[in-house]
Amino acid sequence: MRYKAIAEALVATLSDGAVLLNLQTKRYYSLNETGTRIWEMVQQTADEGDIVATLLREYEVEEPMARAEVRRILDELIDAQLIVPA
C-alpha cells in the first residue's frame, strides 16, 4: 500500500532525525533516523514493500525486523493523522 503525507504537515530535519508538526491537530512528533528515512520515502510515494527493501539495503537489519519497524512507524504516522492512503 502507498501512503502520502497530509498537506498540513511541517517537517524540521535534525541531525539525528526529524520533528513533524500536524497543523490541524497542533501536535508534534519526533522521529529517529529510521523513522525519518521512512517519512522521506512516504513523501516519494514509495509503497510499504519498497520502503522495507530500501531499509534492507541501507541498514544492517533482518527482513522481519525491517517489516515490523516499517509497519509500526506507518501505523504511528496514521494514528497521528500525518499520512493517509494514497
Stretch-by-stretch model annotation:
Residues 27-86:
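Long, charge-rich, low-complexity alpha-helical segments
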Residues 1-36, 40, 86:
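Acidic, low-complexity/disordered tracts enriched in E/D and polar residues
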